[in-house]
A protein has these predicted regions:
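Non-catalytic membrane-proximal stalk/linker segments that position and tether the catalytic domains
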Residues: 2-72
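Acidic anion/phosphate-binding donor-loop and adjacent secondary structure
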Residues: 49-64, 177-183, 219-236
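A short, glycine/small-residue-rich beta-strand->loop->alpha-helix junction that serves as a flexible
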Residues: 77-89
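Short amphipathic alpha-helix
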Residues: 88-97
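Active-site donor-binding segments of glycosyltransferases and PAPS-dependent sulfotransferases
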Residues: 100-156
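Membrane-proximal helix-turn-helix segments that form the acceptor-binding/catalytic region
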Residues: 137-144, 182-200
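Active-site proximal beta-strand in glycosyltransferases
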Residues: 149, 162-179, 200
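Donor nucleotide-sugar binding/catalytic pocket of nucleotide-sugar-dependent glycosyltransferases
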Residues: 194-231
Length: 236
């Protein structure tokens, strides 16, 4: 339950920004104790603009890729928070792929607290893995690559729209519709599993669910243990 609530807050921060999240939390708190809301959102939220990323707006040049692009993988990710386990898995995969000769790019989409791709890259290298990947902000910075990977439901929409890639994959670590009550966000998250991406799932349960319920082609990445981080302590 706590893990689900924490993830929901992270998703809200991704969509609303830190200030928007604080306003949302304050207004909820104010309603509970019958205080006037500090900032009214009535009339301020442009729903169409808020969900504009859902629209089918193809971008990026199609056609043949050069030799460099054919060994390049784009990773489209939500904003990075220090200590995020989901991001840790993504950056570990990037780090290992680079050791095997692949070029990787990281594209942060949606709201981010970073001012530049360079700032984000420095933070990733300091707090996660020393990746060599170029890091950029915004889906407009996507460049041609053999493979483009979505890593959350809000990143799946720009990956669907990006035309400068030969293959689209979806690294799925959670069944994200379950983070919401049945409503718009639940449906928007669920719809991403029917976009025709090739799914790479954390564990077999997700692979079976996405295949059975959404017709998604999937492969499973088993759960592993980094013995450099997790190891039994000597008995006292």
């Amino acid at each position: 339950m706590l893990r689900r609530k924490f993830h929901s807050l992270k998703m809200l921060q991704t969509k609303l920004g830190l200030r928007g999240l604080l306003v949302y939390l304050w207004n909820r708190f104010a309603r509970r104790i019958h205080l006037p809301a500090a900032v009214s959102t009535q009339g301020r939220t442009d729903i169409f603009k808020f969900y504009d990323f859902l629209n089918d707006k193809p971008f990026g040049a199609t056609g043949a890729l050069d030799a460099y692009a054919m060994r390049t993988i784009n990773w489209v990710i939500p904003d990075v928070g220090i200590g995020s386990g989901g991001h840790l898995n993504i950056f570990r995969l990037i780090f290992l792929l680079e050791q095997r000769g692949y070029h990787c790019r990281v594209i942060i989409t949606g709201h981010t607290h970073f001012n530049s791709g360079e700032e984000a890259r420095d933070s990733i290298r300091k707090h996660f893995f020393p990746i060599n990947a170029e890091v950029s902000i915004g889906e407009s910075s996507l460049k041609a690559a053999a493979i483009t990977v979505a890593t959350s439901w809000i990143t799946a929409y720009p990956v669907r729209n990006f035309q400068g890639t030969h293959h689209r994959c979806y690294f799925v670590q959670d069944y994200e519709p379950y983070f919401y009550a049945h409503g718009s966000d639940y449906c928007f998250a669920e719809a991403t599993y029917r976009m025709g991406f090739h799914g790479i799932t954390a564990g077999g349960w997700l692979a079976e669910k996405l295949s059975a319920e959404h017709g998604m082609q999937t492969v499973t990445m088993g759960f592993s243990l980094d013995h450099g981080l997790y190891r039994p302590l000597p008995r006292r």
